[in-house]
Amino acid sequence: MAPEVLPKPQMRGLLARRLRFHMVTGFVLSLGVAALYKVGVADKRKKAYADFYRNYDAMKDFEEMRKAGIFQSVK
């Protein structure tokens, strides 16, 4: 009865293969997170700023602060 021969393990290119896999995975994940941030945070914030400044009246705000006595130089 002959002993069973085990196949030799691959010893070359292990680091390169792992680095390639992890670099691709990291790149794909970073693009996904960036896209989710843009859709979930940046676009909503941009819309909120646009809505605020569409209806913002600086003179009305200034007059309210002047009447409240916030400014010392404006009476």
Swiss-Prot record:
Transmembrane stretches, by residue range? 14-54
User: Any idea where this protein resides?
Assistant: Mitochondrion inner membrane
Q: Which InterPro entries match?
A: Cytochrome_c_oxidase_VIc, Cytochrome_c_oxidase_VIc/VIIs, Cytochrome_c_oxidase_VIc_sf
> Topological domain, Mitochondrial intermembrane: which ranges?
55-75
Q: Which UniProt keywords apply?
A: Membrane, Mitochondrion, Mitochondrion inner membrane, Transmembrane, Transmembrane helix
Question: Has UniProt tagged this entry with the keyword Coiled coil?
Answer: no
What's one GO BP annotation on this UniProt entry? oxidative phosphorylation
Say if the entry is tagged with keyword Membrane: yes
Q: Where does this chain mainly localize?
A: mitochondrion
Q: Which residues lie on this side of the membrane: Mitochondrial matrix?
A: 1-13
Q: Name one GO cellular component term.
A: mitochondrial inner membrane
Q: Tell me the route in metabolism or biology where this protein functions.
A: Energy metabolism; oxidative phosphorylation
Provide the topology term for how it sits in the membrane. Single-pass membrane protein
Q: Which PANTHER family match?
A: CYTOCHROME C OXIDASE SUBUNIT 6C
Its subunit composition reads: Component of the cytochrome c oxidase (complex IV, CIV), a multisubunit enzyme composed of 14 subunits. The complex is composed of a catalytic core of 3 subunits MT-CO1, MT-CO2 and MT-CO3, encoded in the mitochondrial DNA, and 11 supernumerary subunits COX4I, COX5A, COX5B, COX6A, COX6B, COX6C, COX7A, COX7B, COX7C, COX8 and NDUFA4, which are encoded in the nuclear genome.
Family indicated by similarity:
Belongs to the cytochrome c oxidase subunit 6c family.
**Biological function:** Component of the cytochrome c oxidase, the last enzyme in the mitochondrial electron transport chain which drives oxidative phosphorylation. The respiratory chain contains 3 multisubunit complexes succinate dehydrogenase (complex II, CII), ubiquinol-cytochrome c oxidoreductase (cytochrome b-c1 complex, complex III, CIII) and cytochrome c oxidase (complex IV, CIV), that cooperate to transfer electrons derived from NADH and succinate to molecular oxygen, creating an electrochemical gradient over the inner membrane that drives transmembrane transport and the ATP synthase.
Q: State the name under which the record lists this protein.
A: Cytochrome c oxidase subunit 6C
Species assigned in the record? Macaca silenus
